[in-house]
C-alpha cells in the first residue's frame, strides 16, 4: 500500500504504472518534507512510526510515462505552483497576488529562503516558491456585501445585487481622503487564530468599502515586506483571480499598498493552465 495524491493516482493510471511517483512540488503538501533537500524526512517519519516506503517515490523527471494514445504523461504538480506558472511570465522579475475566495502572495526564489509567515515550496524544475495565504482573503469583501444586505433588510428594503450597489458607490463618489484602517482578519491569521477583524473611525459605507479593500491588500503586502526583509528582491506585481479581475478599485488598492502598478494575468483558471503549460514544455 502506498499513499499518493489524486493527481499522482491519475497520472499513474494514465500511463499504466503499478506504483505512483510524485514531484517535489506536490510531495511538500503531504508534510514531513524537507523543502531545501527536496526529499521526505525519513528520520522524522520513522520517529513517529511511519514506514517511509508508505510514501510515493520522488521523481525529478517531468514526464513519467506514455498513455495509450502515445502521448507523454507529465507528473502532477502543486496547484499553487501551477497557478504561478500560468500567471507569471518572468519568474525572476515578477511576483503574484491572487484574490478569489481566499487570497495569496507568491514569489519565486532561486535559493531556499526562510521567511516568517511564508511557506517555502519546491517549484517544478528547480527553485522555490515563497507563498503566504490569508485565511479570509477575498471572502472579506463578500462578508462586507452580506453586511450591507442584512442592513438593508433590517430597514425593510430588499437588496439582491449588493456588489453592483457597492461598485456604483465607488464609481460615483471617489476615494475619500480619510479612509479608515480595516483589518479583515475575520478568521484570524495562520500565526494567531485569535486575531479578529477590526475597524477604526470614519464609519460610512463608502469609507468601509475602501477600508476593506485596503486591508485586503495590506495583508498580502505584509507578506511581501517579510520577503524583502529576508533579503528578497523587488519584482513586478502581477494579479490574478476573479476578485481582482472583476474589481478595478481593488486593483487600485493593491497598487497603492505595493506602490507599484499591477498587471492582470492573461488568462483564467490559472492552475489548470499552468499544469498544461508544464506538460507542454
Where are these predicted regions, by residue range?
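Nucleotide/phosphate-binding loop and acidic/charged catalytic motifs
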Residues: 21-27
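Active-site core segments that coordinate phosphate-bearing ligands/cofactors
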Residues: 1-19, 31-42, 46-47, 64, ...
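Short, conserved phosphate-binding/catalytic loop or strand-edge motifs used
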Residues: 27-28, 62
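A structural motif corresponding to the C-terminal end of an alpha-helix
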Residues: 47-54
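Gly/charged, well-structured mid-domain segments that form the phosphate/adenylate-handling core
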Residues: 57-64
Amino acid at each position: 500500500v502506498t499513499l499518493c495524491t489524486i493527481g499522482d493516482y491519475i497520472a499513474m493510471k494514465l500511463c499504466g504504472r503499478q506504483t505512483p511517483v510524485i514531484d517535489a512540488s506536490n510531495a511538500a503538501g503531504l508534510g514531513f518534507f524537507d523543502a531545501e533537500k527536496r526529499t521526505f524526512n525519513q528520520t522524522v517519519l520513522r520517529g513517529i512510526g511511519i514506514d517511509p516506503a508508505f510514501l510515493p517515490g520522488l521523481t525529478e523527471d517531468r514526464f513519467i510515462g506514455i498513455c495509450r494514445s502515445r502521448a507523454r504523461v507529465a507528473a502532477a504538480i502543486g496547484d499553487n505552483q501551477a497557478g504561478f506558472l500560468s500567471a507569471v511570465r518572468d519568474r525572476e522579475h515578477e511576483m503574484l497576488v491572487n484574490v478569489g475566495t481566499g487570497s495569496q502572495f507568491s514569489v519565486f526564489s532561486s535559493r531556499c529562503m526562510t521567511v516568517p509567515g511564508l511557506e517555502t515550496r519546491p517549484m517544478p524544475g528547480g527553485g522555490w516558491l515563497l507563498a503566504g495565504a490569508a485565511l479570509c482573503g477575498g471572502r472579506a469583501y463578500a462578508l462586507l456585501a452580506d453586511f450591507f444586505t442584512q442592513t438593508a433588510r433590517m430597514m425593510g428594503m430588499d437588496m439582491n445585487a449588493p456588489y453592483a450597489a457597492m461598485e456604483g458607490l465607488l464609481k460615483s463618489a471617489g476615494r475619500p481622503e480619510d479612509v479608515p484602517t480595516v483589518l479583515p482578519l475575520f478568521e484570524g491569521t495562520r500565526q494567531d487564530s485569535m486575531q479578529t477583524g477590526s475597524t477604526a473611525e470614519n464609519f460610512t459605507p463608502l469609507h468601509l468599502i475602501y477600508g476593506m479593500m485596503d486591508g485586503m491588500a495590506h495583508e498580502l503586502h505584509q507578506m511581501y515586506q517579510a520577503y524583502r526583509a529576508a533579503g528578497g528582491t523587488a519584482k513586478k506585481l502581477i494579479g490574478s483571480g476573479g476578485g481582482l479581475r472583476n474589481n478595478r478599485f481593488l486593483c487600485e488598492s493593491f497598487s497603492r499598498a505595493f506602490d507599484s502598478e499591477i498587471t492582470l494575468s492573461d488568462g483564467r483558471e490559472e492552475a489548470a493552465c499552468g499544469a498544461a503549460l508544464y506538460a507542454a514544455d
